[in-house]
Amino acid sequence: MPLFNSLCWFPTIHVTPPSFILNGIPGLERVHVWISLPLCTMYIIFLVGNLGLVYLIYYEESLHHPMYFFFGHALSLIDLLTCTTTLPNALCIFWFSLKEINFNACLAQMFFVHGFTGVESGVLMLMALDRYVAICYPLRYATTLTNPIIAKAELATFLRGVLLMIPFPFLVKRLPFCQSNIISHTYCDHMSVVKLSCASIKVNVIYGLMVALLIGVFDICCISLSYTLILKAAISLSSSDARQKAFSTCTAHISAIIITYVPAFFTFFAHRFGGHTIPPSLHIIVANLYLLLPPTLNPIVYGVKTKQIRKSVIKFFQGDKGAG
């Protein structure tokens, strides 16, 4: 460690650790095994729910609509990739104390975590636009959201999430790490890694804020605008039944937005502004729940709130093979 500290005085020397140590949840190391139990249970529920939903939407012709395409073939698959990138590694830390992660593997995990969450945010935005077209322009729905348009929207969302995250590993690689290689976290997250650097991280912070604006803030603004127009259109409906139907078609999506963005914004602001007021253990727990809780609850929320999915699930378990 003294050698690392002395090297910081020489800006021409670039120090890159061969690996990082993911220390888990700081202050709660003795109860890691107990913390892992609900996380593992949620992960199993998450796998069953999302894989089952992907299969159901593929299998059931009555669910071959844009809304379910976004949810089943996009949101569920992205959730599967995101959680599988982080949770098995966290369970290895909790159960077997396998805390070491290669430097490049850490950068890869960081890229995938941020990239997939960026894509997920875009999918939620597209789902809001889908609801806007369905409620405000119901007669044009089938001609507006055609398969080519859906494919282009999904591709644009994916490319935005991936391309904006590509600089993160390179911004981290340029930094010298001469203090410690111990990360108080269960996975490699951009701010957790760069805080270990002994050089200025101003560029990393600025770029991170820019990405947050281009993805999180932009998507929230689009979602808010969509639901403002939806609310305006629903209120103008003359029939109370029509208004009720319009609102009921949005409740599942609104629930998904809340359980996704609330922990996401907590994690974002805690990293940057809550270092002295928010306990590190709380921050790490919420960061894990942010990646695991929404994907676990989404199939349940959509199954409860969406009549077509409920009917398809019942139909599937009754063994009815006919197309819906």
Swiss-Prot record:
User: What is the recorded membrane topology of this protein?
Assistant: Multi-pass membrane protein
Q: Which GO terms describe its molecular function?
A: G protein-coupled receptor activity; olfactory receptor activity
Q: Which domain of life is it from?
A: Eukaryota
Per the UniProt record, which residue ranges are transmembrane? Answer: 34-54, 63-84, 109-129, 149-169, 206-226, 247-267, 284-304
Topological domain spans for side Cytoplasmic: 55-62, 130-148, 227-246, 305-324
Keyword terms, alphabetized:
Cell membrane, Disulfide bond, G-protein coupled receptor, Membrane, Olfaction, Receptor, Sensory transduction, Transducer, Transmembrane, Transmembrane helix
Q: Where is this protein found?
A: Cell membrane
Disulfide bridges in this chain: 106-198
Q: Does the keyword DNA damage apply?
A: no
Q: Please indicate the ranges of residues that lie on the Extracellular side.
A: 1-33, 85-108, 170-205, 268-283
The entry's function note states: Odorant receptor.
Could you say which protein family the record assigns here?
Belongs to the G-protein coupled receptor 1 family.
The record's PANTHER family line, in alphabetical order, gives: OLFACTORY RECEPTOR 52N5 (PTHR26450:SF18), OLFACTORY RECEPTOR 56B1-RELATED (PTHR26450)
The name of this protein is: Olfactory receptor 52N5
